[in-house]
Every structure is written in structure tokens, then in C-alpha cells.
Amino acid sequence: MKAVETRILELRAELDQHNYRYHVLDEPSIPDVEYDRLFHELKALEAENPHLVTPDSPTQRVGSAALSAFTQVRHEMPMLSLGNAFEENDMLEFDRRVTEGLDLPAGDLFGEGGKVQYSCEPKLDGLAVSLLYRDGALVRGATRGDGTTGEDISVNVRTVRNIPLKLQGKGWPDVLEVRGEVFMSKAGFERLNASQLEIGGKTFANPRNAAAGSLRQLDSKITANRPLEFCCYGLGQTSAEIADTHIGVLEALKKWGMPVSRELKLANGVEECLAYYRDIGERRLTLTYEIDGVVFKVNNLAAQRELGFRAREPRWAIAHKFPAMEELTELLDVEFQVGRTGAVTPVARLKPVKVAGVMVANATLHNMDEVARLGLMIGDTVIIRRAGDVIPQVVQVVAERRPENARAVQVPQTCPVCGSHVERTQLIKRSKGKETVTEGAVYRCVGRLACGAQLKQAIIHYVSRRAMDIEGLGDKTIEQLVDEKLIGSPADLYKLKYEQIIDLEGFAEISSNKLLKAIADSRQPTLARFIYALGIPDVGEETAKVLARSLASLERVKQALPEVLTYLPDVGLEVAYEIRSFFEDEHNRSVIDALLGECGLQLQDQGELGAEFAASTTLEGLIDKLHIPSVGPGAAQKLADRFGTLEAIISADWLDMRQALPEKQAKSVRDFFDDSANAERARAIEAQLKDFGMHWRSEKKTVEGLPLAGQTWVLTGSLERMSRDVAKEKLESLGAKVSGSVSAKTHTVVAGPGAGSKLTKANELGLTVLDEDALLKRLIELGVAVD
């Protein structure tokens, strides 16, 4: 028996190595027939000795019995989508934003010549997945889903032959989440469709649909028979840092058995990125797989952290999409549509033409700035493109074909739906401590909910799944309710009676009662859902979550000054003013008051300020937010350390200021606060922060007085009551430094289920080790809420 077990282990190791050389390195060392012989030998031995079968055996990729449904998986780190670039100018603008966002001297996080270095790789057209490894073994696979919650497809990903069930080599972190794309090659797609035709099965329109459909089969045996492949492009959660650069991470993953794009390249500056894009574009048709663009990422991971995220995409990455098929047609007219926020948007009505196999009669024009940029006139011959391979877009006017009777495109002075006045939006910018107002690209109907179009879209948004989640209220039902004047605002939904609903088209006794129950059940939304449901311009689902998590009460959100709102992640000054303007509007306030008053809504998850927000409001942070000319974060820190309070800075004389800063910066600070409007605005911001419960000193001084100051803690294994990120946040709020590695300087190790080498090392060093219950007890003792 010992000999059989030894032979099984030898065969598994040998087959794993051959899989690695074939699928990852593309350097097979044996012919297929020899691989098959070894595989069948292992399969026979395991059949004779089923007690020796393990989940990571190469034979266990064949699939199992059908599942009844997929379970939900919450991503510890959201799987975000990328922003898109369609033109070279978009890439240049992206590079400018990155460079300005880093605001670092050349050579610090930059490459040669002070240029940002980017990783470059093709954008595979497949399905994004997450692979979670613990102690080197694949324990879970999940789809991206909505970015926050995906589906558990662990059984199916195990059948994808180039996904390692166990990592190669050594040095990988205890917890490693690999992210990448499951796709189907062009040849594999053709073979699949041919075989489907032979058996009279369903064929697929393209490799992307084939890959997605194959991976989400409830019967994993079907998935196992599909020619799926995987290519990794990055990381999710990990218990330890792997490298300092994105390419370094991918090289490490490749060493551990992960397939990485053979087209991966480092570019020094945006010009090299554009050259890479053109090169891949020229070779696109010769590649063995479908791609729809190229992904560029800031290579330095510290720079990525510096840039951060906005809404649902990182600021440090972009997908440069390839142009889709283009066609010529005639612009017959331009009509204007009214959206949820009142935006009056031009839409091109075209002479129908087939583009990439789809008949197109309408195209987006985005806004009037785009119409002006194109020089578009009604009657023009235009080039249209299915931008991003999906949305038809007018990209160019063929000016030489313009007819004599061509007409200019005019914005209507009154709303085409309700007749209210249409006005152009204003944008607020802050530069050198001063605000300036410029004209925006968007025109808006001022009718608000008195406008039927806005009311319908506002209600559709309010009841949507990610907002108040009121089932049974479809678009057609909402149109009926508005047209019959049964509702004039979201608050009126809660006043609907059974007699009103049953008279609507498509409703009977059961469906009417179900709808009334769904409306009643929506009376206790989370704060984040309610904020999102209000439909504040430029406030999407992620920003609503940030507002709720950070400010933790609707009253604080309503009162917050724009500058205070900019403390929050991904909230810029323009969005901050949109939020402020929304809550200052008398009509909006009356609707909210009605919802929370007579309609009986009770918002959940309100309470104390979020720890992340609290930690961000240091004195030096406030000084930096004031945008004093020539004063950056370093100078702000010096001012905070020197004076300790905002009032001391405002009232400091010239000599005191010169002791803190060089002459130019000192003069800039004095000139700024000599303007009484600037001084009063700074005081108002500070007063509101303190009113919200913030009492800061300089960050350095604050940490010194905290109970865990000077202590280094390490988290390992999994936690059940809170995520590791939340635990880290709570420990840091008490002054602790949370590290990813154990050393003699470590004060305490928190070990949950699955703790590996870090726990072993902690025991060897004789360190204090706490389980999750002990951690929670310690946090409670120190006055930190754990629920």
C-alpha cells in the first residue's frame, strides 16, 4: 500500500509539472500520448484506492453532479470595472490625471525621464473570475457579479485545465486571491459550435458568450467538456505583499503556476503605451483569442495606492478599446430626451444602416458640447461607430457631403415633455483657494418632479433593485401611475390604495396585494440605499455607500459643507456641490420630509461617524483641503506640528510663520488668511467637523496618546464576526500598526481558522496570540464597538 501511495504522489507531481509547462510556459516536455498514459495510470490507481483521492489531484478536473443553484460570494475587495479610452486623446488625458494625481518629483515613483511606467496587456473578452487560495490550495472560485457580490463557481473553475488546483514552488502568501479572465480561444469556439451543431445543441454568437455560458453551468461535467482557458491579470485580497510592481506580482504568479499573458510588457510613458496599442491592434486578427482593447495600469503599486479609486473604477488603470466597425449614413434629425436628473440629451435619428451585423437607426450624441465638437448639422452624412462594440455613436461628420439645406442643431428653450425652462448647468472649480464658475456641458429641465419624464425616471430609479428594491413596480406600471396622476413623487407610492392598484393594467387581487406588501416592506432601508434612491445627480451606488459609511446619518449628509464632503473617498468638489445643492432645494427637502414623516420610513445603519472618515480629518488634512497656493501635504504637516490648532495658524504673525515654512510658502499662507472670507470659510469647515464629533490634533500627536500606540499587530487566518479590513481599521483607530508579517517586534498576533505559517512563527517567538473572541473582548474593553 505504501508503494501505491508513493506512486500516486509521484504521478500527481509529474502531471502538475507537465500541466504547468504546457499551459503556462507553452513549453511541453512530453508528447500528448505520454501525458495521456501517465494520466490514465493515475486515474486507475485512484479508482482502485478511492481513499487516496484528494481534491487537488489532476484527475479531479472532470466535474461532478449537477448543482441546483449557485450560492452568493461577497468579495472582500470589490471587483471593479475599468474606465475606457477610445481615442489617443483619452489616453493622454488619463496620463495627465495620473501624473497630476501622484504629484511626486520625477524619479520617486516614475520611470526614465520622469514618465509614469505602465504595464500593458491585451484586454481579453471573457468572464472575470476570482480564485481564492489558502496555503497554496484552490478553495474557491467566484464570478465578479455586481462587483461586490458574485456567484460561487468553485466546482466549475476546477475543470478549467490551466487553473492550478495547487500552487507551484514556494513563497506564496497564506491567503492569495488571484483575479483574471476565463475565455475561449477562437479555435476552441469554432470546435464547440461545430460539436453543438452535430448534436443539435445551442450554438453561441461569440467566444465571450460561450465562455460565460460554459462557466456558469449548474452541471460542472458540461463545463469540463468546454475548451475554457484562464489568464490572470492581478490580485484581490492577500495576506502578504508579493512585489512592489504590478508586473512583479504577475511574474511571481507565473512562477507559482498561474497563466499570464505572453503579451505583457512594461511601457515607459504614455507614448510607449500608444505604440503598444497600435502594435496589438495591427496583430489583433492574428491572435488566437478575441480581445476588445488593451489594459494599461500604473506599474508601481505604491503609486496605485496613492491614486486610489473613484466610484466603481480605479484611477490607476484604463482600458483602451479598439474602434468598432464604422459605417456611413445620414443624420435625419436630432431629438431631445429628458432623463431622471432633468438632463436634456440630444439623440441622433439616422437613416437605418447595418453596423457589425446590427441595424442602427439611433445614436447617442452625449451632450451639446459633443455636437459642437463634431460640427454636426441635421442633414449631414456622418460616420457612426458601435462604441465599445455596443452603443452606436456618431464619431465624425463628412463635411464635403453637407447639403445646402443642412440645419443647425438647437437646444430647445423649453422642455419637450413638460414645457418648463431649460437651463445650462454650472460647474464649480477651486484653484489657488478661489472658486470659479464655468458653463457645463449639460442642459437641464428645471421642472423636477413636475416634469413627467423626470418623475417617471425618478420613480423607476427609486424602486430599482439596488435602491429601495420594490418588486412588482415595472416601468410600464410606473408610467400608468404617473399618467393617471396617482403619484407625483416617491412619497406618493406609500399612499397607494388597493382600489387604485387593482384597476391598473396587468394587476389582479394577488399581484395588487403583493405590490402593497413590497411597498410596505421597503420602509426600513439602509441609509446607503435611501441616499442612492434619492437620485442625487452624480451620486451613484458606490458614492452613496461612502456617504452612509462615513457620515452615518442623513442629517449629517444634508448639513455637510462641500469641503467636508471632499474628505470622503471619491467625492470631488463638483459632486460635493451637487449633493449640497440637492439638499438645499426646497422641493427635495419636502419629499424627504414626507418620506421620513407621514410615510413612516425608518433609516437603518445610522450612528457614529465612520472610523475611516474620523481618521482622515487631521488638522494637516484640513489645511491641505483649503488649497492654499504653494502649500502641499508636507507644508500642511509642518503647520499642524508647529501651531497645533487652526486658529493659531490663522492668527500667526510673520515671524512665527517663517519659523514653520520657507519665505514663499509663509507669505502664501499669510496672504490667504488675510482674506477674511478664506479665514471664515476655514473656521466654518472646522466648526462643522467638530460638530460632527471630530476633535483633532496633529496626526502624529494623536497616535501617541492612543492605547495601542507603538504596538505592531498581525492578522492571519479568517475572521467570522468582521472582515480583516474592518479589524485592521479598528486596531489602527486605537493607534496600532497592522503588519502583514510576523517578527520579534510584533506585539500581538490575531489568528483565525486557517492560520498558517504566521501562527507557527508567532508560537516559536513566544508572542501573544489571540483568537477572534479574545480580539473582540479586547476591542470592547478599549471602547470600540464591534457590532
From Swiss-Prot:
InterPro entries: BRCT_dom (IPR001357), BRCT_dom_sf (IPR036420), DisA/LigA_HHH (IPR041663), DNA_ligase (IPR001679), DNA_ligase_AS (IPR018239), DNA_ligase_CS (IPR033136), DNAligase_adenylation (IPR013839), DNAligase_N (IPR013840). The keyword Manganese applies. One of its GO terms (biological process) is DNA repair. Residues 703-787 form the BRCT domain. The active site is at residue 123. NAD(+) binds at residues 32-36, 81-82, 121, 144, 181, 297, 321. Its EC number is 6.5.1.2. PROSITE patterns: BRCT, DNA_LIGASE_N1, DNA_LIGASE_N2. Zn(2+) binds at residues 415, 418, 445, 451. GO terms for molecular function: DNA binding; DNA ligase (NAD+) activity; metal ion binding. It catalyses: NAD(+) + (deoxyribonucleotide)n-3'-hydroxyl + 5'-phospho-(deoxyribonucleotide)m = (deoxyribonucleotide)n+m + AMP + beta-nicotinamide D-nucleotide. Its cofactor is Mg(2+); Mn(2+). One of its GO terms (cellular component) is cytosol. It is an enzyme of class 6 (ligase). Keywords: DNA damage, DNA repair, DNA replication, Ligase, Magnesium, Manganese, Metal-binding, NAD, Zinc. The keyword DNA repair applies. It comes from the Bacteria. Belongs to the NAD-dependent DNA ligase family. LigA subfamily. DNA ligase that catalyzes the formation of phosphodiester linkages between 5'-phosphoryl and 3'-hydroxyl groups in double-stranded DNA using NAD as a coenzyme and as the energy source for the reaction. It is essential for DNA replication and repair of damaged DNA. PANTHER family: CHROMOSOME TRANSMISSION FIDELITY FACTOR 18 (PTHR23389), DNA LIGASE (PTHR23389:SF9). This is DNA ligase.
